Amino acid sequence: PGGSGRELIWFPDPVGPRDCYRAALPDPVLLHHAFPEVGRITARMAATRRDRLTAPLPMLAPSHLEGGPGAVRVEVRGRRDGVEDVVVLGASGRPAVAAAAVAATAVEWLLTGRNRVRGMVGLAEMVEPLAFLEDLAGRGLEAEVFEGDRALA
């Protein structure tokens, strides 16, 4: 259920590590439609204990216009060439600027006929992912790959 399952997750700078909880978001449904062979898709959202405590209450003060820096992180686990593998990608930036870059790039793809399918689909089904990420990088929104060693030195 949404709000359970606390986990410390690392996001790209300047956001860094955040406590995250399962979130009742539509993203897993859209992703499952695009990738039906995937066994489990979950969504998590960063929140402080105060955020979780006050979530059901009405807001007494308006939130910030944009909310400050934001980040997204995608972790994919599975087998590649018979070996268990984990790939973690992320991006950070001002949420409104990032959303505008994604929307503008998607519209550009539609207008130039670069979309893979027609009709009502999610973005993951519409575009070729690597080429889309390259176009986003051209607009200043770059994906980052988390690399590291699991062993502690």
Residue ranges and their predicted role:
Residues 1-153:
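C-terminal catalytic/substrate-binding lobe primarily of soluble NAD(P)-dependent oxidoreductases
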